[in-house]
């Protein structure tokens, strides 16, 4: 153990370079030797070190040799083990090689057996097929002799259905199948039989079509694919159903043609019946075709059927155009429209002439009633085509195994003769001409028959809260117009034609903008504005005849025939003067009554504008786009992305109409305020929020107060004491007079119209009061009184309408600022302190806040 430690220490000393260090030390000592004794000592140290190092080296060599011997023995032992393992490995490899050879031999044997089995099965199947061939030939031969064609066709079909198509021409079949009774080769025999049966089936099919023997016809039709004549069977069947379509169409037309001009809707029903026949054929006969021929062959029949349907539909359309004299009607309408454009009539100066233009039409033009019936029949024709196109497209995709994300019309529909005819003959354009002409002429008639309701029952200071959209007073023209637009819109939507509805929406926007808003509504407003007196007030209208019947006798001329100069007296002169005064008063009264009636009509037309927006939204958005009505577009416009595009068009059209209506309605409301209500509101405001406490002492002093808001005359209103702090008579009087002024308008006007009018009034009031409040002076009690008055003022005027209350924000902040304590203000700047400034979103700036504080006369300086 000690030897191992010494060896380890010696080895570590070698690794650490101890010998080199000792040598360097000896060299250094050698240089410093000066005496003999030092040399002896150095020699002794070197000898000791040498002996020590030699001993350690011997021990290290011995230890290393021993360790090396141990490792060598271990390696020898491992080599022995590896040799044994290698021997076993070679034995295993030899065993695997032997097994592999044996497995390959077995696999080869199995493959050989499988091949032999496959050959045996193939031979067996071949023999079975030959036997089937021979049996079916024998069966077909016997069936042909007994004229059992179904059995014969079934046997031939089984022969044709054999998996090996070359079996019938094989040498084995040629030798085995023929017999003494049937010596022909199978291939030649089957070919001759198919040819013979083809001719026979065709003759019997044609005979069955002539005799209408449906059972025989169906049997023959089923047997064509059995003998390999699929195309012939489909062609014959297609011709048969096309003949049915043509015969039915001619039968209907010939039976009812003599009464067609009297029977409106006749042609649409004929076309509907035609499409029903085609749809029934496609639905019912598709089962037979799919069973006997395969579903994919139904497309072939549908193509043939559609050609015949297009032909008959085009014929019906031609007869319709000729019988209803479409071309002549279009010509008359164009002439009428041209004559209307050439008439230079000023609607502003002579509204009645325009209103009766619709009645002074040429006698040759179609009547509005007949035009409406024609549009209905025309719409039904296009609707029938649209519904049939959708049905045909769905069935086409079903039989073609197509599953498109968006339904598209197949080529027989999109490129068919009838669709091409609708485009080339400009049928859509003609239909739109009818619709627009009906809309324009009917609107003219509704103007000529206009009725306006009476407002007398609504003119009261008592609020009426039972209004709905139906009960608002409007002109009868609006109701007629909405009914007309709805009727024509339904006719256009029912056609299912994207082009028609898109074009009609554009024309409808133009019609609303030009005919309704400008030529009718705007001209009505301008005509009434010329009749409105600035001092007119909203009160009940009493016709002149009822009011003056009692006084008409007193102002009638005398019955005598004497000259006025022959008997002049003071009494006669006084009577004459009285008569003249009464006549002048009556003229003034008549003028006032006309102005009152004009104001009534103005409010009715204002309601008409706002109700028209409600009706247009209901007509376009609610009835067509919202809730369950969304199916209207999807059902009538199923192709491509038509429904989504039309939805956007409808939304944009409504937006355009509402924008134009908003402009006109705001203009009308603004005129109503500026010319009728502004002076009255100004007079009412003259008594409130003013310096003079006696401003409401007399009525004659109100105008002067409203013009002079300075604080020069009597500054006591908001410099109050305990005695007059509770005096709110001014604001209560204003609220009472305000209610008397505004409630009749609220009872009459539509909510949105009233809200717009009130918004305009509030804007004016806010502007006036914001200018007036800077002229006031306050003490502490006066500020509190102002706060109470302003709260009552705003509450009575705005109610729960917070949008209107927001307009008074600047005034309320001024009052709030006046009520703040002096501690909240910075004495240096005069403005509120910074820590308090951040608690409010101020709409008044710093200068205004300083100015507002200076209005208090009892503040701390």
From Swiss-Prot:
User: Glycoprotein: present as a keyword of the record?
Assistant: no
User: According to its UniProt record, where is this protein located?
Assistant: Golgi apparatus membrane
Anything else the record notes? Present with 1620 molecules/cell in log phase SD medium.
What the entry lists under InterPro entries is as follows:
COG4, COG4_C, COG4_M, COG4_N
What organism is recorded for this protein? Saccharomyces cerevisiae (strain ATCC 204508 / S288c) (Baker's yeast)
Q: Which GO terms describe its biological process?
A: cytoplasm to vacuole targeting by the Cvt pathway; intra-Golgi vesicle-mediated transport; macroautophagy; pexophagy; retrograde transport, vesicle recycling within Golgi
Please give the function described in this protein's UniProt entry.
Answer: Acts as essential component of the peripheral membrane COG complex that is involved in intra-Golgi protein trafficking. COG is located at the cis-Golgi, and regulates tethering of retrograde intra-Golgi vesicles and possibly a number of other membrane trafficking events. Possesses ATPase activity.
Q: Which UniProt keywords apply?
A: Golgi apparatus, Membrane, Protein transport, Transport
Protein name in the entry: Conserved oligomeric Golgi complex subunit 4
Q: How does it sit in the membrane?
A: Peripheral membrane protein
Q: Which GO terms describe its cellular component?
A: cytosol; Golgi membrane; Golgi transport complex
């Amino acid at each position: 153990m000690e030897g191992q430690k010494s060896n380890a220490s010696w080895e570590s000393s070698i690794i650490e370079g101890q010998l080199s260090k000792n040598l360097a030390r000896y060299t250094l000592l050698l240089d410093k030797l000066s005496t003999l004794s030092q040399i002896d000592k150095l020699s002794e140290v070197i000898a000791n070190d040498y002996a020590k190092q030699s001993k350690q080296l011997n021990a290290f060599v011995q230890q290393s040799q021993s360790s090396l011997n141990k490792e060598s023995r271990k390696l020898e032992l491992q080599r022995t083990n590896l040799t044994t393992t290698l021997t076993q490995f070679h034995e295993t490899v030899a065993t695997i090689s032997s097994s592999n050879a044996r497995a390959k031999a077995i696999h080869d044997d199995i493959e050989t057996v499988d091949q032999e089995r496959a050959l045996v099965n193939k031979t067996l199947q071949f023999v079975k097929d030959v036997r089937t061939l021979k049996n079916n030939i024998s069966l077909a031969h016997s069936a042909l002799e007994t004229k059992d064609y179904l059995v014969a066709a079934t046997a031939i079909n089984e022969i044709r259905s054999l998996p090996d198509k070359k079996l019938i021409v094989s040498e084995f079949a040629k030798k085995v199948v023929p017999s003494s009774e049937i010596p022909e080769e199978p291939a030649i025999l089957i070919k001759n039989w198919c040819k013979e049966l083809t001719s026979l089936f065709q003759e019997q099919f044609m005979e069955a079509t002539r005799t209408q023997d449906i059972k025989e016809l169906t049997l023959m039709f089923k047997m064509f694919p059995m003998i390999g004549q699929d195309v012939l069977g489909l062609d014959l069947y297609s011709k048969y159903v096309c003949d049915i379509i043509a015969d039915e169409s001619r039968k209907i037309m010939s039976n009812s043609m003599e009464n067609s001009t009297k029977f409106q809707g006749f042609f649409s029903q004929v076309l509907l019946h035609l499409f029903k026949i085609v749809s029934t054929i496609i639905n019912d006969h598709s089962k037979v075709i799919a069973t006997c021929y395969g579903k994919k062959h139904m497309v072939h029949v549908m193509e043939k059927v559609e050609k015949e349907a297009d032909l008959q539909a085009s014929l019906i359309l031609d007869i319709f155009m000729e019988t209803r004299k479409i071309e002549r009607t279009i010509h008359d309408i164009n002439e009428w429209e041209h004559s209307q454009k050439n008439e230079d009539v000023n609607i502003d100066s002579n509204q009645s002439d325009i209103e009766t233009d619709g009645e002074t039409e040429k006698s040759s033009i179609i009547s509005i009633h007949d035009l409406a019936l024609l549009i209905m029949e025309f719409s039904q024709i296009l609707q029938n085509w649209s519904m049939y196109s959708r049905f045909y497209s769905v069935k086409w995709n079903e039989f073609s195994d197509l599953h498109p994300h968006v339904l598209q019309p197949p080529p027989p529909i999109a490129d068919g003769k009838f669709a091409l005819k609708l485009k080339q003959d400009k049928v859509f354009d003609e239909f739109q001409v009818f619709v627009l002409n009906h809309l324009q002429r009917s609107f003219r008639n509704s103007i000529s028959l206009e009725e306006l309701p009476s407002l007398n029952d609504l003119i009261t200071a008592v609020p009426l809260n039972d209004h709905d959209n139906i009960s608002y007073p409007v002109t009868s023209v609006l109701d007629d117009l909405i009914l007309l637009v709805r009727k024509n819109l339904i006719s256009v939507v029912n056609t299912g034609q994207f082009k028609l509805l898109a074009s009609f929406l554009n024309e409808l926007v133009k019609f609303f903008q030009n005919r309704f808003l400008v030529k009718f509504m705007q001209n009505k407003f301008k005509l009434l504005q010329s009749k409105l007196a600035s001092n007119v007030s909203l009160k009940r209208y009493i016709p002149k005849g009822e009011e003056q019947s009692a006084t008409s006798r007193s102002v009638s001329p005398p019955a005598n025939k004497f000259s006025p100069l022959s008997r002049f007296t003071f009494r006669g002169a006084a009577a004459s003067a009285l008569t003249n005064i009464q006549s002048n008063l009556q003229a003034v009264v008549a003028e006032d009554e006309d102005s009152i009636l004009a104001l009534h009509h103005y409010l009715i037309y204002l309601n008409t504008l706002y109700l028209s927006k409600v009706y247009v939204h209901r007509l376009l958005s609610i009835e067509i786009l919202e809730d369950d009505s969304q199916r209207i577009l999807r059902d009538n416009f199923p192709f491509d992305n038509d429904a989504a595009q039309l939805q956007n068009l409808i939304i944009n059209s409504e937006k355009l109409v509402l924008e134009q209506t908003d402009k006109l309605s705001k203009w009308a409301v603004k005129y109503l305020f500026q010319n009728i209500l502004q002076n009255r509101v100004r007079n009412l405001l003259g008594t409130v929020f003013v310096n003079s406490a006696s401003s409401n002492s007399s009525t004659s002093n109100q105008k002067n107060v409203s013009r002079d808001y300075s604080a020069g005359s009597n500054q006591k209103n908001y410099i109050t004491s305990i005695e007059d702090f509770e005096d709110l008579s001014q604001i209560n009087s204003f609220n009472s007079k305000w209610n008397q002024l505004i409630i009749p308008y609220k009872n009459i006007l539509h909510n949105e119209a009233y809200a717009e009018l009130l918004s305009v009034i509030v804007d004016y009031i806010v502007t006036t009061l914001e200018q007036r409040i800077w002229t006031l002076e306050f003490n502490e009690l006066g500020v509190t009184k102002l706060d109470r008055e302003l709260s009552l003022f705003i509450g009575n005027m705005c109610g729960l309408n917070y949008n209107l209350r927001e307009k008074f924000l600047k005034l309320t902040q001024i009052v709030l600022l006046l009520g703040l304590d002096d501690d909240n203000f910075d004495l240096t700047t005069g403005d509120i302190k910074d820590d308090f400034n951040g608690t409010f979103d101020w709409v008044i700036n710093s200068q205004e806040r300083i100015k507002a504080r200076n209005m208090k006369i009892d503040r701390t300086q």
